[in-house]
């Protein structure tokens, strides 16, 4: 039995390191890129859902580009909205359509809980309060067509964006 424990302990360490590496986002989760579309002023957030990218326009022909998870088939949308609220480790109540699809979810998941899909921070969007730009508890979904209309970011990326924007920041969602 002692032999088995000695063997399992190193195995557990190896598996733990593999799982930690695979659960971590890529090192270049965000980058600064050329952004020459003069339609948007500095400080604007532009989300291009077909690219699954969010751009924070810096001006001077550059933007910070972040990967995002976007609305799945039938849930994608486009339009102009604003950041309506900013929250660190927010609690989450599943909207009616999520609750319908996943009735086992509790009515409220506390902020900071590993089960909370909002992740490290959320910025709610105007237009009814049903959509947000937020972190995630499942980093592997960033970059996919996966949400009910919200925009999922790696937690370190949503915190970076959070620090750059304020309530009232313009958000333009395009396909």
Question: Residue locations for each model-derived region?
Answer:
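Residue-level detector of beta-strand structural context in well-folded domains
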Residues: 43-45, 52, 121
């Amino acid at each position: 039995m002692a032999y088995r424990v000695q063997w399992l302990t190193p195995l557990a360490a190896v598996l733990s390191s593999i799982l930690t590496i695979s659960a971590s986002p890529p090192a270049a989760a965000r980058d600064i890129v050329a952004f020459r579309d003069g339609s948007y002023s500095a400080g604007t957030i532009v989300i291009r859902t077909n690219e699954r990218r969010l751009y924070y326009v810096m001006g001077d022909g550059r933007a910070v580009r972040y990967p995002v998870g976007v609305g799945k088939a039938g849930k994608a949308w486009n339009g102009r909205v604003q950041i309506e609220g900013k929250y660190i480790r927010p609690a989450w109540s599943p909207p009616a359509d999520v609750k319908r699809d996943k009735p086992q979810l509790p009515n409220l998941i506390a902020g900071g809980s590993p089960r909370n899909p909002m992740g490290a921070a959320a910025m709610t969007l105007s237009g009814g309060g049903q959509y947000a730009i937020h972190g995630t508890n499942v980093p592997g979904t960033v970059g996919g067509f996966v949400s009910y209309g919200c925009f999922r970011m790696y937690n370190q990326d949503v915190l970076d964006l959070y620090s750059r924007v304020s309530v009232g920041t313009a958000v333009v969602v395009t396909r």
